[in-house]
Amino acid sequence: MPRITLTNVTKQWGKFIGVNDLTLDIEDKSFVTLLGSSGCGKTTTLRMIAGLETPTKGEIRFDDKIMFSSEKNINVPAAKREVGFLFQNYALWPHMTVTQNIAFGLETLKWKKADISARVAEMLKTMKIEQFAQRYPAELSGGQQQRVAIARTLAPKPRVLFMDEPLSNLDAKLRGEMRTELKRLHKDMGSTFVYVTHDQLEAMTLSTKICLMNEGVLQQYAPPLEVYNRPANLFVADFVGNPAMNIVEAKAKKISPNVADIEIFGHHAVFQANDDFDMKSEKISLGIRPEFLPISDRGDLEGQAYSTLPAGMETTVKIKIADEILSSVVFGAIDYETDAKIRFSVAGNGILMFDRVSGLLIANGRVVFEN
């Protein structure tokens, strides 16, 4: 399976820039998710890698082989890139059985009949759809059709599998099941998967790395937990996480290589960073995940219950303090009366400090309030 390298890839239509100077290294056998909201450039990026869209400039390589180069005037057609596609629309032939749908691409590639039969049987078993071999697409559920589409795409043994929002047509339960299947399939197949979604849950649970984009610009390219715990900037911090990260404006004054005095919620506190850091401005924003706002009678801060959103296993509690509405997540079903007093703390060493002007991450650490 190839290592895919994009170097300074740009796609422009007139004055509109869809993807701007993107450099990306997709490692062999990785599962990379292109994540972002509609119009961010993620699907355009996938289509350029696959050969369905021609970049305006830049270079794309599969291992050492150039697939596209604006300087060298090279553009290898999609059909010769040995890739597979799985889209939101399964595009199964309605007049063909499951077996015939899976075999169709192999027949087009002039595989021998014996090899086709063996490969179809292998894919039916891999995708756990052997019992549906002689059924037609109309006789299958959405999840079953999805499995057939995956089997058909993987049958020719593509070097890379491209998936564009493949689970968006499924209900929530089926999406969860298919996430499990896709992750297992990636491990078993040993292929390189490139996956497009706007759903952060899919990106977090499936990926070896997330490529988060906004307005055609790469914001962060890192493993899911790094994106979650150390977002590169305020956009990433706000985009990833449900409930969303609390972003609170504050003022800070550095007093030692890894410590700053801060004013937050009308209180004085100290930010103790895990490492030395540099500050260019006193204007900062603190990023606090909801799980780092534990509710306790012995909490350092007092606020009011703004709303309570129980969801069974956990409850999101909205807390009003000063001019801020904060989200806290607590385990179990808890209900607070509106405007009831709540004591809580800012806990853990995963509190993030951002430069409010540039939006870039400065440091992570802990916040200690003065008594």
Q: What are these model-predicted stretches?
A:
Residues 58-70:
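Conserved ABC transporter NBD signature motif
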